[in-house]
């Protein structure tokens, strides 16, 4: 009789363990090791992460010429991420044409992709469809109206 009670408990524990492992893996928590510019970071597992829906000014690099506010945009993203672990949520299209992981980046439950746009240091990339496209466009419109970040001196 005791075995009849034990086996369902063992099966239940195994199922719970599988769900917990999947849940933990889905969290995908990392440290940021480098901020390349306002829309691209590198994390501790070596992946380069491109923030979905964010188009930040470029900084001077072997691949691009510096654009106005490029350094300020990068510095703002560095401040947003400083000393914080980030959660990476890969988008529907996992990689861009340069091999970067396309993802939403969260720090302390704040969606960093939206925050940098809302703070005025990046534009919403509306060239393609993604989950937060309308929200990010609204954040950009709000930042422009408030004349914050790189929109401070725009007409």
Language-model region placement:
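Small beta-barrel nucleic-acid-binding modules, primarily SNase/OB-fold domains
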Residues: 1-155
């Amino acid at each position: 009789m005791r075995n009849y009670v034990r086996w369902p408990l063992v099966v239940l524990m195994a199922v719970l363990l599988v769900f917990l492992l999947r849940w933990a893996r889905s969290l995908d928590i990392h440290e940021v090791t480098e901020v390349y510019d306002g829309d691209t970071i590198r994390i501790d597992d070596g992946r380069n992460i491109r923030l979905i829906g964010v188009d930040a000014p470029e900084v001077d690099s072997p691949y691009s010429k510096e654009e106005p506010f490029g350094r300020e945009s990068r510095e703002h993203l560095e401040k947003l991420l400083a000393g914080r672990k980030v959660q990476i949520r890969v988008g529907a299209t996992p990689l861009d044409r340069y091999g970067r992981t396309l993802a939403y980046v969260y720090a302390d439950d704040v969606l960093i992709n939206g925050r940098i746009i809302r703070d005025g240091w990046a534009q919403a990339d509306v060239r393609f469809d993604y989950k937060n496209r309308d929200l990010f466009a609204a954040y950009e419109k709000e930042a422009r109206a408030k004349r914050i970040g790189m929109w401070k001196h725009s007409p």
